[in-house]
From Swiss-Prot:
PANTHER family, alphabetized: F-BOX/RNI SUPERFAMILY PROTEIN-RELATED (PTHR31900), SUPERFAMILY PROTEIN, PUTATIVE-RELATED (PTHR31900:SF30)
Matches recorded under SUPFAM superfamilies: F-box domain (SSF81383), RNI-like (SSF52047)
Pfam families linked to this entry: F-box, FBD, LRR_At5g56370
InterPro entries assigned to the protein according to its UniProt record, in alphabetical order: F-box-like_dom_sf, F-box_AtFBL13-like, F-box_dom, FBD, FBL13/AtMIF1-like, LRR_dom_sf, LRR_FXL15/At3g58940/PEG3-like
Residues annotated as domain F-box: 2-50
First and last residue of the signal peptide: none
Domain FBD: 361-412
Protein name: Putative FBD-associated F-box protein At5g56410
Length: 503
């Protein structure tokens, strides 16, 4: 039915304006007297300083006429917000988003604007304050931490988070804290410990943020992402999130230790660490179906230390393996061995350097093909560069040994060896699928396409064939013969057959 019935003309116009960027909505004020103040009733406000202002300050030196225009534009925006936000006529400000780079924006102004939004029952608040170097942090009003209407809070860069001892955010479901500074370690912990309906949490730490330890113990949490930079003074972090479904960890701390207690509902994981916590992280997520692993440069040794450990990903179906200036063939091979049900593999080495023993390694592995290549891998994707020998050798290994592969996507950039790599992979893509497979593996593969009864009958052919039937992956028992010729002996033979075969 007609969705606008019952709206007055002004209400309808405000509704239409709410779908426009705030800057565009403000420009409509010159159309007529009716439109002059309509934008001041908008429930959602978004003010973005030009990113070029930030680049200008970081560049330094003399300024051109264009630079002066940018500065004047930023100054006008500051004066506009400072003048009009206190007079905003909407009784409820559903959303306020501020992105600020200019030094002219004072921390006290940001404090005032946030306080106005809180007084208007704000639901979503996003503040990014990134002035040039040396600017002091913006301290937000204490009323923010008792805002009952607040559902989403996103703070970034030069924000000082000072959580009072008594606070209440009963509606907060999304909390993003990106490279902010905390008044003390207890501020972060108080905030994390008293958000009882929180579902989405992002904590990205920076050097000098006044935090050494933190614990995420939130029963309602569904998504968790955290980042610890290499120079951060971290000692320990604890994670206890029984409802968590998505987990992203970027841990480059040199001294931090992790303790992960309970994540039984986890479905997807992204892990990138400096290496010393990788074993604990992977041991705690062995039951996930989707895993993305990012290997940063100069950390290959820490990761390959896992090679041979008894960690099995019994449920893993999707693996994304990304390397950056690193050589990690051994770790990738170990992951393939540890993932017997893997269906989709993506390998990204667009920015990697090759190890000297790449080709030798994958050729040595030809006699020990991972089970997932023989029975489950259906999709392989390689994103590489034209000089990547490691990626080429991996792709060759996959194409040569994957028995169930349905789709192979090869995307490589420019490089001296691009054409040679493409030609070689094309040959492997069209080659027969039994090259390099041992006789027993090949025979078992053939038997898997035959009815179980027929496969069993081959056991009388020779000693080599005697026990091959026990390695067949697909079993099918059919008592049709018992139904067409029912007798006690036929039923007994069938039961004995099944019992003997399953031993």
């Amino acid at each position: 039915m007609d969705k606008i019935t019952g709206f007055s003309d002004d209400e309808l116009l405000v509704k239409i304006l709410s779908f426009l960027p705030t800057k565009a909505a403000v420009t409509t004020s010159i159309l007529s007297k009716q439109w002059k103040f309509l934008w001041m009733r908008l429930p959602k406000l978004e003010y973005h300083d030009d990113i070029k202002i930030y680049i200008l300050y970081m560049r330094g030196g003399s300024r051109s006429r264009t630079d002066s225009i940018l500065l004047e534009k930023s100054q006008r925006m500051w004066r506009f917000i400072d003048k009009n936000l206190p007079l905003h006529s909407s009784p409820v400000i559903e959303s306020l988003r501020l992105t600020i780079y200019n030094e002219l924006f004072q921390p006290e102004s940001i404090n005032l604007w946030v306080e106005i939004a809180v007084s208007r029952c704000v639901k979503e608040l996003s503040v990014r304050f990134s002035p040039f170097k040396g600017k002091r942090d913006a301290l937000l009003p204490t009323t923010l931490y008792t805002c009952k209407s607040l559902v989403t809070l996103k703070l970034r860069e030069n924000i000082l988070v000072d959580v009072p001892h008594v606070f209440c955010l009963p509606s907060l479901k999304t909390l993003h804290l990106s490279h902010v500074t905390y008044a003390d370690e207890e501020s972060l912990q108080r905030l994390l410990s008293n958000c009882f309906v929180l579902e989405d949490l992002v904590v990205e730490r920076r050097v000098g943020d006044n935090v050494r330890n933190f614990a995420v113990i939130i029963p309602s949490l569904l998504s968790l992402s955290f980042e610890i930079l290499g120079q951060c003074s971290s000692e320990e972090y604890v994670i206890h999130t029984p409802s968590l479904k998505y987990f992203k960890a970027r841990d480059f701390g040199e001294c931090s230790t992790c303790l992960i207690l309970n994540m039984p509902k986890l479905e997807e994981v992204f892990v990138s660490t400096a290496g010393h916590n990788i074993k604990k992280l992977l041991e705690s997520v062995t039951y996930v179906k989707r895993l993305s692993l990012f290997i940063p440069d100069n950390n290959a040794e820490a990761f390959t230390a896992l090679y041979g450990d008894v960690i099995v990903f019994n449920q893993l179906e999707h693996l994304t393996f990304i390397i950056w200036e690193a050589y990690c063939s051994k770790l990738l091979y170990w992951l393939l061995i540890a993932s017997p049900k893997l269906r989709n593999l993506e390998f990204n080495d667009q920015f990697s350097s090759d190890g000297m023993d790449t080709l030798v390694f994958w050729e040595q592995m030809i006699t020990s093909v991972p089970q997932c290549l023989l029975s489950s891998l259906q999709t392989f994707k390689w994103l590489g560069n034209g000089d990547s020998i490691e990626g080429k050798d991996l792709a060759t290994f996959i194409l040569r040994n994957s028995c169930q592969l349905k789709t192979a996507t090869i995307s490589i950039g420019q490089g001296q060896n691009k054409l040679e790599i493409e030609k070689e992979l094309l040959l492997h893509q069209n080659m027969d699928k039994i090259s390099g497979i041992s006789d027993d593996v090949l025979l078992v593969k053939i038997l898997s396409f035959r009815p179980t009864k027929v496969a069993v009958s081959t056991s009388v052919l020779s000693k080599q064939w005697k026990y091959l039937r026990k390695r067949v992956l697909k079993l099918e028992y059919d008592d049709t013969e018992c139904k067409t010729k029912p007798s006690k002996s036929s039923h007994k033979r069938f039961r004995c057959f099944v019992k003997r075969f399953c031993k």
